[in-house]
């Protein structure tokens, strides 16, 4: 009986993981971004994105392939990075190829009401960025 319960739990875990992966596959565009630093909070709305010509798109592809393209780096120019992605618990981890180096960028993620919420905190814990994306 314990063996059957264990196998059933393993199957449910694998099924849930596949569902999470399938839900993320596609192109997501950032339409709202909030930066929190201490007691200060700055929000960039969809209208502000449009007015500034700003955009950031995330491409979660099959076989763990990933691409991001946009102009939010602060320089205004459009840049593209490619790599891979994976889900670990409530985090999505993008491994980006930056020249000769690889860099892991991890976000806590939540899918809610057809929106993807990506949250990242700076290593020192002082700045938190929350991006809200919708599927294209």
Where are these regions (language model features)?
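Bacterial Sec-dependent N-terminal signal peptides
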Residues: 1-24
